Amino acid sequence: MNVFWFLPTHGDGHYLGTTKGARPVTLNYLKQVAQAADDLGYYGVLIPTGRSCEDSWVIASALVPLTERLKYLVAIRPGIISPTVSARMAATLDRLSGGRLLINVVTGGDPDENRGDGSFLDHSERYEVTDEFLKIWRRVLQGEAVDFEGKHLRVQNAKALYPPIQKPYPPLYFGGSSDAAHDLAADQVDVYLTWGEPPAAVAQKLADVRERAARKGRTVKFGIRLHVIVRETSEEAWKAASTLIEHISDETIAAAQKSFSRFDSEGQRRMAALHDGRRDNLEIAPNLWAGVGLVRGGAGTALVGNPQEVAARIKEYADLGIDSFIFSGYPHLEEAYRFAELVFPLLPEPYASLAGRGITNLTGPFGEMIANDLPPQAK
């Protein structure tokens, strides 16, 4: 099992949909989140992409030398950048990070943003471009001089003279809910990602991708993207969930849902259908809450509960075949600690160990000394 955290390069705070309790997302703050994730033993961090975020490649490049073990899941955007240039960027960052780069393949689900970035392709064309892009990208990073002529992309003698550390190339992660997305995942990527739908729906998606991959003689790993609200008691967790959205007005929800309706993303449509823009019935499965999706695009669901409940839901998804879990919580610095402290001990190794991923406690016992003389009691 690999557990990721999230870098909030699009903003952070105590509440959604308001400036109340918000905090500036500076390089120093992102460094704190990344270093906390590194020290706590998270496998990696996802860096979001798009016009609402700081650039993911610049952020990753700034944070790589400030962390030791943490991997960075960074987006590439077929149709927006050349596959050859993207491959060379990936090779460089993989080398400079000591092999800590992971690649998130993003086709882009907002036509308005895509047009602003110079891409006027429809949904099916974007997947055609992504397929051609990855065929070039993968071969370039394996050391080939690539000649390729497809429907959308053409290169001659495309090459990267400096290879990546990871072989054959940094692992490819990819998410999408349409048939075209499932075909692409089955054919080209290493890890298929889904947003946090109820377990039965996730099981259907995984089975479909697994079957398509088997027909091509391939196997694909699976991951899930979820928020998490965990507290020592279930009552506290559900109160925290309500508090997170207490400052969102109905007008803000309506405006957000109107914006999402222009997307041609099947995954975004499925997220919106979980709540229909209403806040009166947000627990859509045991301990699975759709409140985040009222105003946030992309991943819109959270696991909510006490540590045992959250761990049980994680195991439920793991039993479906999920082995990468990408979590986040508001605010991201505090919640990175809270999740690690409350839930890691209930997860499989290496997370079940207080030492995390081999991190040793060099300063003495955990907790503050008692009366300047006694170590804190172990529990």
Swiss-Prot record:
It catalyses: an alkanesulfonate + FMNH2 + O2 = an aldehyde + FMN + sulfite + H2O + 2 H(+). InterPro entries: Alkanesulphonate_mOase_FMN-dep, Luciferase-like_dom, Luciferase-like_sf, SsuD_RutA_monooxygenase. This is Alkanesulfonate monooxygenase. HAMAP family: Alkanesulf_monooxygen (MF_01229). NCBIfam families: alk_sulf_monoox (TIGR03565), PRK00719.1 (NF001939). It comes from Pseudomonas savastanoi pv. phaseolicola (strain 1448A / Race 6). The keyword Nucleus does not apply. One of its GO terms (biological process) is alkanesulfonate catabolic process. It is an enzyme of class 1 (oxidoreductase). It holds the Pfam family Bac_luciferase. GO terms for molecular function: alkanesulfonate monooxygenase activity. Its EC number is 1.14.14.5. The keyword Oxidoreductase applies. It comes from the Bacteria. Belongs to the SsuD family. Keywords: Flavoprotein, FMN, Monooxygenase, Oxidoreductase. Gene3D superfamilies: Luciferase-like domain. Catalyzes the desulfonation of aliphatic sulfonates.
